[in-house]
Amino acid sequence: MTIKRIIFSDIDLKKLDDIIDVRSPSEYEVDHIPGAINLPVLSDKEREMIGTIYKQNSKFEAKKLGASLISKNISNHLKENIREKNRDWLPLIYCWRGGQRSYAFATILDQIGWNVAVVDGGYKSFRKQVSEFLNKNIENYFLILLTGNTGTAKTKLIN
């Protein structure tokens, strides 16, 4: 099989079973693609540790440790989160820039036999596309800011 690189704007979300964000929990918490689930390949602590080694010591040593931790974490996700997925499961995977973390996860899923795709450019690309769309189309939308205390029938007004 082959891992597909897909530009987010070209994706038919209705055909996907899951959108998987493999970034760390804190990155996911800040923001993520709507509907995505977080299956991090590195914890926040692991990501920080590898980043420190990468910058202060050796890129090679950081990559070796990263590969070890990522392999362990992907193995855990296979056992705990996705082992029940059938052969026809269609996941879309992304990380920050569509690089090493998403491809590590995608490569293993691909080797198992799932038809997997990676967001080209990762979450950063998705965010840029959303921003460009809004900047080009803002005049087509009418925004209303609705405020008020609890119990003042805001929900009734919206409905």
Regions found by a protein language model. Name each.
Residues 13-86:
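Positively charged, proline/Ser/Thr-rich regional signature most characteristic
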Residues 118-131, 139:
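Long, charge-dense
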Residues 66-119:
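Catalytic cysteine-centered active loop of the rhodanese-like fold, especially the PTP/DSP P-loop
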Residues 142-159:
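Glycine-rich phosphate-binding P-loop
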Residues 79-84, 128-137:
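A short, basic/flexible loop-to-alpha-helix module at the beginning of a structural domain
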Residues 1-11, 16-17:
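N-terminal extension/subdomain marker
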